[in-house]
Amino acid sequence: SGITRICVSTGNIGQSSSFYCKYMRFAEIAKGSFDRESVKKLYKLDDSAAEYRMLKNSEQDCILQLIQFEKNTGRCIRDTANPWDYGYLDIAVQSSDNMKACLDFTAMGYKFFSTPTHYCADWINMDVSEGVMFGPDKLPIAMIQRLKEPIPKIDGYFGNMTDCAQVIRDMDQALKFYGDILGRKLVFDDTMPDGLVDPVVQVPYGTHSRLAMFLTPGYPVVELIHHSIEGTSLKETARPENLGIFATCFKTDDLDGTLQVCSSSGFDVIRESVVHELAPYGKIRSAWVNGPSDTIVEFFQTL
């Protein structure tokens, strides 16, 4: 499968769920909670219970998991980070009208990391407008509007998730992980023309940016971004107790086999497998792996 779940720590689960359901065509399909003992086993947090809600649109198989921990710090993972720092970056969505979205959400009090910018995405033969909004908990949401046919019909502001992006220290290592180990299909890998996406991603002039994409039909693209400018790892910040994307999850039919292959390839298991209940899947076994550029990647198997 592709990205089965995107895990987002939130400071106010009700407000966050309302935002995604109202503006991004998600529906709440399940919810649940973890007691303190479970949170310690699953998330390595002491003395903190948690509640979660599972959101999903009608066209994709990826779930957005919102989870609120009692002992969250209130600190946003990318609040003080540079956009070229290594770790999960944003969730991208189709947009019907970027300028209208920018005006309307600004009026609602939301801030923009970058206002809509037009560029020609030759790798998909598309003219696009792209801007990045800070959504709930300052989570970056990239809005991508197609300006050239085929233009999808979108009711409301936003459509499907297009990708979940991460900034990578070592592109070859990341390609090995998602391609060779996980067997995902690489559909794009190239260096962007200088300056093309600089206004969107806010990197210094003269930065060379390489982009790679892994596509699994029915799921958001795994988007990998490598910049020539050196960044800093967000490993110590991109933790469950801080707000934002802290993990992506993949379903497997053989958890032990997957963990063995990851470990033998240099991607260590950082949280051993635990059997637990998770709606809407029922009973599962899950474990964490230290993925490319120290990102948390969860693998789980339904039982």
Show where each model-derived region lies.
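A cross-kingdom feature marking solvent-exposed beta-strand/loop segments within repeated
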Residues: 32-51, 70-89, 99, 106-129, ...
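Core segments of cupin and vicinal oxygen chelate
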Residues: 9-61, 120, 124-126, 166-219, ...
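N-terminal beta-strand motif that seeds the catalytic metal site of vicinal oxygen chelate
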Residues: 1-17, 30, 86-93, 142-175, ...
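Internal, hydrophobic cores of structured domains that mediate oligomerization or house catalytic pockets
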Residues: 127, 131-145
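A compositionally biased, intrinsically disordered/low-complexity signal enriched
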Residues: 20, 24, 28, 66, ...
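Short loop/beta submotifs within extracellular cysteine-rich repeat domains
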Residues: 27-29, 36, 62-64, 73-75, ...
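Vicinal oxygen chelate
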Residues: 2-11, 51-71, 77-105, 128-134, ...
